[in-house]
From Swiss-Prot:
InterPro entries: aa-tRNA-synth_I_CS, aa-tRNA-synth_Ia, Anticodon_Ia_Val, M/V/L/I-tRNA-synth_anticd-bd, Rossmann-like_a/b/a_fold, tRNA-bd_arm, tRNAsynth_Ia_anticodon-bd, Val-tRNA_synth_C_sf. One of its GO terms (cellular component) is cytosol. ATP binds at K530. It catalyses: tRNA(Val) + L-valine + ATP = L-valyl-tRNA(Val) + AMP + diphosphate. It comes from Mycoplasmoides gallisepticum (strain R(low / passage 15 / clone 2)). Keywords: Aminoacyl-tRNA synthetase, ATP-binding, Coiled coil, Cytoplasm, Ligase, Nucleotide-binding, Protein biosynthesis. It is an enzyme of class 6 (ligase). This is Valine--tRNA ligase. The keyword Coiled coil applies.
Amino acid sequence: MKRLKKIDLNQKYDHKTVSEGVVDFWLTTDYANQDSDFCDPNAKPFSIIMPPPNLTGILHIGHAWNLSIQDLIVRYQKLVMGKINWIPGTDHAGIATQTKFESIQRTKEINYKKDDRTTHFNNIYQWSQESSQTIKNQAKSLGLALNWKKEKFTLSQESNKYVLDVFVKLYQQGYIVKKYTLVNWDTKLNTAISNIEVINKETTQKLHYIKYYLKDSNDYLVIATTRPETIYADVAVFVNPNDQRYLKYHNQMVINPLNNKLIPILVDEYIDMEFGSAVMKCTPGHDHNDYALSKKYQLEELSCINFDGTLNELALEFSGLDLYEARELIVKKLISEDKYVKFEEITSNVGYSDRSNVIVQPLLSKQWFLITTKFVDEIKKLVNNEDQIKIYPKRFLDTINNWLDHNQDWCISRQLVWGHQIPAWYHKDHPDEVIVSINSPGDDYYRDSDVLDTWFSSALWPLICFDDGLDQKEFNANFPNSLLVTAYDIVFFWVLRMIFMSWLLKKSIPFHDLLLHGLILDEHNRKMSKSLNNGVDPIQIIDQYGADALRLFLTSNTSPGEDVSYNVEKINAAASFLNKLWNLARYLKLIDQSKLTDQPLDSLDHWIIHRFNEVNAGIQDKLKEYRFALSNKQLSDFIWDDFANVYIELNKKAQWSKAKFELANDIFRKFLIMLHPSVPFITEQIYNTFEFSDSKPSIILEKWPGLIKIENALDHFDQIFNLIIKIRNFKQSFDLKNKDTLDLLYKNEVSYIKDLTKYLKTENVNLIKISDQKLNDLFLIATEDNEFYVVYTQDKTKIVDKLVVEIAKLEKEVERSSNIVNNKNFKKKAPKEKYEAELKKLSNYQEELKLKQDKLNSLK
C-alpha cells in the first residue's frame, strides 16, 4: 500500500514542508474512506453531512471552524469505529447566488435582462461552478477526510429530480398548497421571502398623527401611523372596547382622509390603548396584524403598493411613485388640507430583508406554502425525545421549542430564475386550474415561473446525500446520520426544516446528535461582517501558520454553543505547540540506541503509564460530549507537563534503558494517534517517519489506543513528582537556574529513597538525612508523607522588593477590573461577550496575584 514520502526530522519545523504532498497523498489513497482492518464489516459507518456552503464566493473563517470541528470528530470516529462516511457538497443558494451574479454582470455593463430564462440560468450555472471549484480547493487545503467521490450539489440533475419528486408527493398529501395571502415581500429582489428571512432592526421613524373625520360631522379621530402611504388601502378603524375615550364612536363611520371613502369604526381588545392615540387604522393588505383582524371580521383586503415598491392606481395622483417619495408628498397633501396634526420621532423594530437589507413590505400575493402547522406538534414531540435526538448544548432546546410554539406556515416560492422551478402547470385558457407533476400535461399548459426557496432543497440535504433510490441497504446504513454540526444561527432556517422533511418523508429524524457551535467574533468580540470589514481569510492564516495551527486554535477554543473570538496570540500558541511536538519527535528519533542500558522499568515508568491511562479515558469521555476545548487541553497538558517536562526530562538526565525507550516510543505513538484528529498534517508526517512496529500506511488506518496494561501499583512516584515540581517552583521563585545545586534535608524515613535520590539528582538536588539539626530558618517543602527543608543562604531582598512592586500593580488591576464587573449598568448594558471578557480578565489578574503572594510568603 502506498505510503507518504518520508520527511527529514532533523530540519527545523516548517508548516509548508510538513504539509507538502500530504493532501495529494490523502486524496489519491483515500485511506480515510476505506474500512480499517479492525472494523466490523457489517457495522454501520459514522455518517455525517457537510453543511453545504453557498456558491457566492470563498470559504470564510466560520466555514473553517465548522469544518475543523467536523473533521476532528470524523477522524476520531475513524480511529474508534474504522468506518466513516462524510459527504461534501455545495448549496446553489438561490437569492444570494442570483443577486451576486447579476451584480457582477451590472459591474461589467452586461445586460442580463435581455436573456431568456434558460440562457440566464445557464450563465449563472457556469459562474457558480467556477466558485464551487474554488470552495472545493479551499476545503482540501484544510485537510478534510471528506468522501469526495460522493460529492453532491443541491441543484444538480439528480438533486433536482429528488426535490421535484418530493414537491409532488407533499402536494398530493395536502402538505403543499398555493394560496392568496399576505406575504413578506422584498421590493429590491422582487420576490417573496419567508418569515425567518425577515430581520428586525431598531429603526428611527416618524410617527404621523392624522385626522380621520367622522361622517357628517366636524368631529374627528386622530390616528398615528408610520406609513401614511398605506392609508389608500385602509378598510376600517379600530379602538379598544375598554377605552372610555371612544365609547361614543363605536360602529360609526369615518372618512378616509386621502380618498374620501367611508370606513367603519370597529372594536377589538387587540388595540393597544397606550400606543399613539389608541385609534388604529386597519390595512390588511400591508400589515400582518391587520390581516389577522380582517379575517376575524371578514373585511376587504386592498393593496396600494406594487411589487416593485411603487404605489398603484389606488393611490390616485401618486400612482407610479416610489413609496418613500410618495410618503413625503402625501404628508404635504394632508398638511395642506388641514388633516395633519403632528409627527413624533420614534424608535421601533422594523423588518428588513436578510438578503437585500431593504425594509420588507407585507403584500398580498399568491404563493406556494408548506403547511407546517399541520405537523408541528409531532415535530415538537420528536425534538424533545432524547432517545430520538440529543442536542448539544441542551439549553438550545428551549429556544427550539419556543420557535415551534410560534411556528407559521412556510412560504416556499420565490420569484427567481436560479433554483428548482416549481413543477406546477396551468392551462392557457383556464389559468386558475393547476396540475402538479414533473412532466407537462400537454401543449396547452405552461409551467409556473417561480422557483423553490433555497432552504427547501437544503432541508432535503441528508436525503439528497444518501437516498438515491438505488441502494436501500446503503441508505439504511447511513440514515439517520450520526451527527450534524452547524452554527446556532441557522437552527430555524435549516436544522428544523431538515427535521420537518425527514419526518414527513421517512417518519424519522435526520440525525441522532445535533452539535451547535457559536459564531466567530473578532478580537474585540464583535460579529464578523462585511460592513465592519473585520473578516479573516482562513487561507491567509493557513499560508502564514499552516492548517494544523488554524485547526488547533479553532478546536481548542470550542465548547458547544459558545462563540469564539479570533486571537492572533492563540494562533501563535498553536503554532508553538506544533514546533514543540516536532522537536520532541526529533529528540526521540535521535536517541542513540547503542547506548541504551538494560535497566528495567521503575516507578517513573509506572507513573507515566497510569497518567496516560487516566488521560486517555478522560479525553474519550470529553469527546463523546463534544467538549473539544477540554479534551485538547487535557491531551496537550499530558504531552508537555507529564511526558515531556517530567518523563522525558528525568530520563534524559538519568540514562535511557531499552525498556524505557520502548515505552517512551509506545506512548509517543499512542498520543500521536490521539492528536491526529486535531492536527492531521504533522501527525501523519511524524508517524510515517518513525516506522513504528506494525505501523499502517497512514495514521488514519490506526485504531484509537487502548489502555496500557500494568500490574505494578503507582508506587510513590506521585510524591516524587510533586516534590520535583515544588523544587522547580522554588528555584523559579529565587531566580535560580535548574543547574544550580540545592541541599534538601529530611528527618523521617522514606520508603522510596532509591528512586527519590535518583530523580532528585537530575534536578541537581542533594538529598541529606539529618537527625537533630535545627530547621527553623530553612524553607519547608511538605509532601503527603514527609517534610523536606531547602538549604538556601543567598540574599533574598531584591526578589522580595520586586515581588512587592508587582503585587501592588496587580492589586490595582484587580480592583479596577472588579469595579467594572460589579457595576450594575455595565452588567446590564454591555454586550455579553464584553462582560465575559472582563470577567475572564479579572480571573486572570486574581490568579496571577495569588501566585505572586504565595511566592512572597515563601520568602518571608
